[in-house]
A protein has these predicted regions:
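Positively charged n-region of N-terminal signal peptides that target proteins for export
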Residues: 1-4
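Bacterial N-terminal signal peptides
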Residues: 8-16
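Short, flexible segments with low predicted structural confidence
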Residues: 15, 28, 81-84
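Feature responds to low-complexity, polar/acidic, surface-exposed segments characteristic
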Residues: 27-29, 65-72, 93-94
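Eukaryote-biased recognition of intrinsically disordered, low-complexity regulatory segments
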Residues: 86-89
């Protein structure tokens, strides 16, 4: 029996420090009104206490809400309530949508129409353990220096923002994620 191949639509990766972007703006990283760098206190005011919390490495946490037949996962910059949103994922049929209206169940064609791009093959994702297909777009990298509170030093590297739409074998969206990452150089 052939295993179905999980498909990722790696839609847009935005490299930015000072608002430089292309087809997607940082402000477009918004799922059901939750956006990048929003105060976690605002998320708690809207959704209440999380159903469960996973702690991040080395700092931060992921607040998980069970909504309908799916999950809303909100990553925070700190284990404290005063943290800010660093990423959001919706998995399954939550009824939630990206700012553009794309939601779980949308077709890959709809996503491409809104954001552009094409499907490409990538090597296996560690968690999925199989090859993935995705759409990607990126812009020029900008560098910055930031203070790393965990390690206690200034770090030179780059920030980037990413928005991924994961697809099933029928090219329907099954998961949506956005986040910010920082990589040292």
């Amino acid at each position: 029996m052939k295993k179905p191949i999980s498909i990722i639509l790696f839609l847009v990766t935005i490299f930015a420090v000072s608002g430089v972007c292309s087809a997607l703006e940082k402000e477009d990283l918004n799922i059901d009104g939750i956006y990048m760098d929003q105060r976690m206190l605002d998320v708690f005011a809207r959704y209440g206490k999380p159903d469960r919390i996973e702690h991040g490495i080395p700092v931060g946490r992921i607040c998980i809400y069970n909504i309908n037949d799916g999950e809303l996962r909100v990553s925070a910059s700190s284990a404290e309530e005063s943290g800010t949103v660093t990423g959001v994922t919706i998995i399954g049929n939550t009824g939630l949508a990206a700012k553009t209206g794309i939601k779980v169940g949308s077709d890959a064609e709809e996503v491409i129409k809104v954001y552009g791009g094409k499907v490409v093959i990538r090597s296996p994702e560690p968690k999925l353990k199989e090859a993935t297909r995705m759409i990607e777009h990126s812009i020029e990298v900008e560098h910055d220096v930031r203070y790393n509170p965990y390690y206690g030093f200034k770090d030179y590297g780059k920030n980037f923002y990413a928005l991924w739409f994961y697809l099933n074998d029928d090219n329907k969206v099954i998961r949506i994620s956005f986040w910010r990452e920082y990589s040292s150089e």
